[in-house]
Amino acid sequence: MGFSFGLLIWAPMAFGRAGARSNLISDNYLTFVSVYALLLLSDVLFWNCFGFDRSAVQAYFLAPLKMSTVLLGKNVAAICLIFLEITGVSVVCALLRLPLSGLKILEAFSITCVVTLLILSIGNLSSLYNPRPVNPSKSFRTAAGGRTQAMLMVAFPLALLPVALAFLARYAFDSEWALFGVLFVGAALGAVVYAYSMSAAVQAAEDRKERIITALSQGEGPIET
């Protein structure tokens, strides 16, 4: 979704007007598309990562497997998918001869990495405190619950705060080094937050085991209960 919709939605705003070739969106087109892809995929990859497992989630609690390993595996899979999508968008932008450079690609990957790290920190907890079974045939609009959409409206701007500070630093110091410096600090803080949220998520999984299985077993699922 982010690959197709991101390119189609942001392209008119970035390059649609004559003489508007140099503005915030066009200069950072790949970054905008990458962050938009995160937004579109956030419910499946972050906020409710056990949704498609549904009743099969009980296998995670029955198998001799640590919940931290399960969460880490899902997080790594989400990161790989996001980075694969950004790579695809970068290739398409290059083929279409859109304004693109090695620095802009590095910037887009760096920003996406920081935002993803912060979203994963929140999403691991959300997936265990607000688990919902998801039907793969349903769209994002019908699959995401009201509580999840409200959380997205609050959490996503918070995750974008280091990015906003990085852009402000680049504007203030007129230097790309300032942007990457702020992003590095944001990544370091994000790593600390992620480590804390992982331990909290593991504890939540242990304390809420029955409620998680019950919530995800509602309706049809891969395992009959």
Q: PLM features: what roles do these ranges have?
A:
Residues M1-Q58, M67-T225:
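Hydrophobic alpha-helical transmembrane segments of membrane proteins
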